[in-house]
């Protein structure tokens, strides 16, 4: 059974008209979770993208990022919501569909020129991923690639991220449904 068929679709969540792609059904399945990690690991071992650390976006990016960091032998750096990191942080505010939000990283999380793989579960508008990339760059890091389990191409995040020059990899997509 492929990855896409293991992802539950929840209609009208979190609001009417939204088709929510729920990866919890994928990652609770040991075969499904292994497929995700093995496919991403193989992709990054074989495609020549060079990076030193994995940056995971709260919260589902922690699940994916932690497992990938382990299998690839890399360190893991969390991107968190405000007030969740105990030491000095760098913060970035970004636009949402209705308002703004903020994310943070420790100021000592990366060193100048350090190359990272940025990971999250799902790419929709691209706002959070671009904000996380902004934090990486604010700290002097370089985003070597971005990886997602799911891409929702109709929402436009992939196009927006590619236009900014970032490399993207995803395992499956839900187009027009």
Curated annotation (Swiss-Prot):
Q: Which SUPFAM superfamilies match?
A: PRTase-like
Q: Which InterPro entries match?
A: Ade_phspho_trans, PRibTrfase_dom, PRTase-like, UPRTase/APRTase
Gene Ontology CC terms, in alphabetical order: cytoplasm
Q: Where is the signal peptide, in residue numbers?
A: none
| Pathway terms, separated by semicolons | Purine metabolism; AMP biosynthesis via salvage pathway; AMP from adenine: step 1/1
Q: Which GO terms describe its biological process?
A: adenine salvage; AMP salvage; purine ribonucleoside salvage
Give one GO molecular function term.
AMP binding
Give the enzyme class.
Answer: transferase
Question: What catalytic activity does the UniProt entry give for this protein?
Answer: AMP + diphosphate = 5-phospho-alpha-D-ribose 1-diphosphate + adenine
EC number, as in UniProt: 2.4.2.7
Keyword Endoplasmic reticulum part of the UniProt annotation: no
Alphabetically sorted, this entry's keywords are: Cytoplasm, Glycosyltransferase, Purine salvage, Transferase
Q: What Pfam families does the entry give?
A: Pribosyltran
The entry's localization annotation reads:
Cytoplasm
Top-rank lineage group of the source organism? Bacteria
Q: Which Gene3D superfamilies match?
A: 3.40.50.2020
- Complex and partners: Homodimer.
Q: What family does the database annotate?
A: Belongs to the purine/pyrimidine phosphoribosyltransferase family.
The protein's role, per its UniProt record:
Catalyzes a salvage reaction resulting in the formation of AMP, that is energically less costly than de novo synthesis.
Q: What is this protein called?
A: Adenine phosphoribosyltransferase
The encoding gene = apt
